[in-house]
């Protein structure tokens, strides 16, 4: 168990939980889902379908008692409007803190600090809402500028808040701080350095602008990979300066600690690189072509006419059979329209779950492919959403363990596998194999992009030629075959730009997710219990290692299990197509 802390003056506020992109998406036929339509109407609203005084019961794999409900106002997404909030509008809140401290009024100081924190959270939420609007139309420069401006307003307001409390810590009434805050929080305020903070804010603004430039490039019909590489080179320079300012030996060390709060080092991650290359990459080499051919031979069209409602129906069907608490969360998501999975060619090509702090609720964003991936992307993001629905999030001091978060999401993908016959009919076998191979792909690419970026950020004088050479070397070491233009493949992965060194979390979490599949094959009820115990652990209070210890899943960082999982997958016929 851990206590999460965030030093806002130095660390970026990473507010987006991105969903896994580029995972070998394949299409799906709609016949099976269409045939389920009437049943879904019944299972989604049993009170309406059952006779008066009766409630239609659906047998679930698990019962209640895994989560504590979180109090919130029940609002639809359309009701969550904040607009822009400037740092100037925040200044009076900090002035109130100063005034209360000068009067040495404990009650007034408490009230001023509380109101300042709530307003700061509101500014952060406004930034998230505007980012969502911008991502819906990534071609709109005005929207992008507005979102960027709001994000900067949050950074500036957070800095003003810390500066104000730092001044209180140096004043004659500094004891007010120890009565209002925990000791570790007071230490943050005391250690605030205005000069370093201003440098950090300048670098953060440069980084945000470069990320915006990449988003604009990725929204085009065809990504200009050379331009994207140029943006990336500038990002590497800026982020390296951030690490130096923070006193870190390397940007990898800085990101692992400050952004992702991992309980292992970049050097430890090399164990995952090794198992990815030795145990999981051979599975991709052996089965990718065979499975692709089977998909082609099956006659499944690449454009299946999948609608958002098809995806929602599938989500509700599966969650209704997991547990009452999972079902409640899914129905709340749908009832209050807390998702955007509609298609638009203007959308940013990604998927993520964003927490809207002022409203105590998460929101799912996804740009669909019109393929089977639309379902698995939603199942994945709902794993994040479920955790956020029950646990909430601390906007100011919470630090997420993304490894645990990704096990909660990739584990949800695994738990849906048992419903594939109902959802996809005759295509279930091949699509189940594809989902499992996607998880193998997560292990391999999660390790590959971590190794790639660790090497990139370790270069003292990085050029574009050297950047591409490093990718070629790393790419080949994971068993992938070169093709024309492959050296720019990394530019299509948005995480490399928005959340550097995030991808190892996919690898670290996909391994126990595949282990969870073995439990699912033996006992769906036991697997559901295991998953819900993982989901019931807040990713701001626990590490992935805590969840693995609690549930008996293997910690691959300490006990290599890749060879065992790979062998069991093959022996079980997970990738065999009849």
Task: Give the ranges of each region predicted by the language model.
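Sec-dependent N-terminal signal peptides
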Residues: 5-21
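Sec-dependent signal peptide cleavage junction
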Residues: 18-36
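A well-structured
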Residues: 33-40, 45-309
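C-terminal, non-catalytic "cap/extension" segments appended to globular domains
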Residues: 61, 186, 263, 378, ...
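Post-HExxH zinc-binding segment in Zn-dependent metallohydrolases
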Residues: 277-279, 400-430, 434-437, 441, ...
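Catalytic zinc-binding patch centered on the HExxH motif and its immediate surroundings
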Residues: 304-305, 339-361
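Short pre-active-site segment immediately N-terminal to the catalytic Zn-binding motif
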Residues: 359, 363-378
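Catalytic Zn2+-binding segment of zinc metalloproteases
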Residues: 383-396, 415
């Amino acid at each position: 168990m851990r206590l999460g802390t965030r030093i806002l003056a130095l660390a970026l506020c990473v507010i987006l939980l991105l969903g896994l992109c580029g995972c070998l998406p394949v299409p799906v036929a709609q016949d099976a889902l269409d045939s389920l339509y009437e049943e879904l109407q019944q299972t989604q609203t049993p009170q309406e379908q059952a006779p008066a005084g009766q409630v239609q019961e659906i047998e679930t794999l698990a019962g209640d008692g895994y989560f504590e409900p979180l109090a919130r106002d029940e609002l639809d997404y359309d009701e969550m409007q904040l607009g822009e909030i400037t740092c100037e509008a925040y200044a009076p809140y900090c002035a109130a803190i100063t005034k209360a401290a000068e009067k040495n009024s404990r009650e007034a100081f408490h009230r001023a600090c509380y109101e300042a924190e709530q307003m700061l959270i509101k500014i952060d939420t406004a930034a998230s809402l505007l980012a969502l609007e911008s991502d819906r139309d990534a071609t709109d420069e005005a929207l992008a500028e507005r979102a960027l401006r709001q994000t900067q307003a949050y950074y500036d307001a957070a800095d003003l808040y810390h500066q104000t409390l730092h001044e209180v810590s140096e004043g004659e009434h500094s004891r007010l701080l120890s009565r209002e805050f925990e000791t570790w929080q007071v230490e943050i305020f005391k250690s605030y350095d205005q000069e370093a903070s201003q440098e950090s804010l300048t670098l953060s603004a440069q980084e945000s602008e470069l990320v915006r430039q990449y988003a604009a490039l990725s929204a085009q019909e065809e990504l200009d990979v050379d331009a994207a590489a140029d943006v990336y080179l500038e990002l590497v320079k800026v982020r390296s300066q951030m690490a130096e300012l923070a006193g870190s030996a390397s940007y990898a060390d800085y990101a692992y600690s400050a952004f992702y709060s991992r309980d292992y080092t970049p050097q430890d991650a090399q164990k995952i690189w090794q198992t990815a290359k030795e145990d999981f990459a051979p599975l991709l080499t052996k089965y990718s072509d065979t499975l692709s051919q089977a998909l082609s031979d099956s006659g499944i069209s690449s454009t299946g006419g999948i609608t958002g409602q098809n995806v929602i129906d599938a989500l509700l069907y599966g969650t209704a059979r997991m547990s009452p608490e999972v079902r409640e969360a899914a129905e709340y998501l749908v009832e209050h329209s807390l998702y955007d999975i509609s298609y638009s060619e203007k959308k940013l090509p990604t998927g993520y779950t964003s927490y809207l702090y002022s409203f105590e609720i998460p929101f799912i964003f996804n740009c669909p492919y019109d393929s089977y991936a639309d379902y698995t992307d939603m199942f994945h993001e709902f794993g994040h959403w479920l955790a956020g629905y029950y646990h909430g999030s601390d906007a100011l001091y919470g630090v997420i363990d993304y490894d645990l978060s990704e096990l909660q999401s990739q584990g949800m993908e695994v738990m849906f596998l048992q419903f594939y016959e109902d959802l996809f009919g005759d295509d279930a076998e091949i699509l189940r194999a594809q989902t499992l191979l996607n998880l193998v792909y997560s292990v391999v690419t999660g390790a590959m992009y971590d190794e790639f970026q660790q090497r990139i950020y370790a270069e003292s004088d990085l050029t574009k030629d050297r950047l591409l050479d490093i990718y070629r070397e790393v790419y080949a070491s994971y068993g992938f075959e070169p093709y024309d233009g492959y050296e720019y493949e990394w530019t299509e992965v948005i995480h490399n730009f928005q959340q550097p060194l995030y991808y190892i979390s996919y690898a670290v979490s996909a391994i126990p997710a595949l282990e969870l599949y073995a439990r699912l094959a033996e006992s769906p009820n036991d697997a559901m219990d295991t998953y819900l115990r993982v989901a019931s652990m807040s990713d701001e209070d626990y590490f992935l290692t805590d969840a693995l210890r609690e549930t008996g899943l293997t910690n691959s960082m300490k006990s290599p299990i890749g060879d065992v999982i790979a062998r069991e997958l093959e022996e079980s016929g997970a990738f065999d197509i009849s």
